[in-house]
């Protein structure tokens, strides 16, 4: 048991280091790529570079993974066709994420301290999408914690299963929508969450 715990901690630490290096290298490349001059400006900011859009899109894998971890197990078990797709695609990422629960939290803290709090200065566009992804991650975590704290008669009932399916679908839709907007160089417009992300981004400038 202790060996498994040590392996999970070691794996989680390695994942965090690798993720941090990917973000750091991407940021360094982003700094060296000339910004594109474009007359179409988004919120009075120069049109984001390809690297900035790619980094912003990548961040949304965090709330997506958290949503699958919190709501996806029931859905995967109930639907065979989803299980087949899952095993051939996302399982390689989700399984290690589930086995090391601290990975998501450590990535959250790392992104918040380094990029949101301003240890490394980044553009408002990237900061907005990082903050928004972190808010979505927190929302998934809180809702998932509430669901798991419900009595078994409710959590594992037909209503509980359908609620988990609905939340998973919403998580997928929001993550894909926000990631697509990031790739297009646009700011998302998710009710309440986007406004909170804008306010947090401005308050940390």
Swiss-Prot record:
Q: Which organism is it from?
A: Cyanidium caldarium
Question: Per its UniProt record, what Pfam families does this chain match?
Answer: TIC20 (PF16166)
Cystine pairs annotated here are none
Which InterPro entries does UniProt cross-reference here? Tic20
For this record, the Gene Ontology CC terms, alphabetical, are: chloroplast membrane
Family membership, please give it: Belongs to the Tic20 family.
Taxonomic superkingdom:
Eukaryota
| UniProt keyword terms in alphabetical order | Chloroplast, Membrane, Plastid, Transmembrane, Transmembrane helix
Q: Where in the cell is it found?
A: Plastid, Chloroplast membrane
Topology in membrane: Multi-pass membrane protein
Q: What parts of the sequence cross the membrane?
A: 5-25, 54-74, 102-122, 130-150, 163-183
User: What is the protein's name according to its record?
Assistant: Tic20 family protein Ycf60
């Amino acid at each position: 048991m202790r060996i498994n715990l040590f392996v999970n901690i070691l794996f989680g630490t390695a994942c965090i280091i690798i993720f941090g290096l990917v973000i750091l290298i991407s940021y360094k490349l982003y700094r060296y790529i000339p910004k594109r001059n474009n007359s179409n400006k988004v919120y009075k900011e120069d049109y984001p570079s390809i690297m900035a859009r790619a980094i912003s899109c990548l961040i949304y894998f965090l709330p997506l993974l958290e949503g699958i971890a919190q709501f996806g197990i029931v859905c995967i078990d109930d639907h065979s066709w989803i299980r087949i797709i899952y095993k051939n695609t996302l399982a390689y990422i989700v399984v290690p994420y589930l086995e090391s629960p601290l990975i998501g939290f450590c990535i959250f803290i790392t992104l918040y301290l380094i990029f949101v709090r301003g240890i490394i200065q980044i553009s408002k566009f990237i900061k907005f999408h990082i903050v928004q992804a972190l808010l979505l991650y927190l929302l998934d975590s809180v809702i998932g914690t509430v669901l798991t704290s419900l009595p078994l008669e409710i959590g594992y009932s037909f209503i509980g299963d359908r609620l988990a399916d609905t939340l998973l679908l919403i998580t997928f839709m929001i993550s894909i929508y926000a990631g697509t907007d990031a790739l297009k160089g646009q700011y998302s417009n998710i009710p309440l969450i986007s406004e909170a992300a804008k306010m947090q981004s401005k308050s940390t400038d």
